[in-house]
Amino acid sequence: MGSGYAKKKKEAKIMEQQFLEMEASLEQKRYEGQAGNGLVSVVINGKCDIVSIKVQPTCLDPEEPEVVEDLFRSAFKEAKEAMDKEMSVMRAGMPF
């Protein structure tokens, strides 16, 4: 096999290393979303795992639990959109 094969193999190894580094950094990244003027806050990492949830007691009404549910969904969506935006920039710089 010629030098073309060796070059491609080396490029593949570099790409694999870049991918592994990017994947490892995703767990360290944090994205926050808030809803209801900060009544609910959700923080996720770059793998979309929830890291923390904060709920202000003033929005906890046992008569209307759907309010907190809606705020949580909105806060999570905001955090995920921030993550997706950064991920698209990161992917644009990758050769694959």
UniProtKB/Swiss-Prot annotation:
Q: Is the keyword Ribonucleoprotein in the record?
A: no
Q: Could you tell me which Gene3D superfamilies the record lists for this protein?
A: Nucleoid-associated protein YbaB-like domain
Q: What Pfam families has UniProt attached to this entry?
A: YbaB_DNA_bd (PF02575)
What InterPro entries does the annotation carry? YbaB-like_sf, YbaB/EbfC
Q: Does the keyword Cytoplasm apply?
A: yes
Its keywords, alphabetically, are: Cytoplasm, DNA-binding
> What does the UniProt entry say about where the protein is found?
Cytoplasm, Nucleoid
Q: Major place of localization?
A: cytoplasm
How does the record describe its quaternary structure?
Homodimer.
What is this protein's function? Answer: Binds to DNA and alters its conformation. May be involved in regulation of gene expression, nucleoid organization and DNA protection.
UniProt similarity note: Belongs to the YbaB/EbfC family.
Query: Known PANTHER family for this protein?
Result: NUCLEOID-ASSOCIATED PROTEIN YBAB
Write down what this protein is called: Nucleoid-associated protein CCA_00330
Organism per entry: Chlamydia caviae (strain ATCC VR-813 / DSM 19441 / 03DC25 / GPIC)
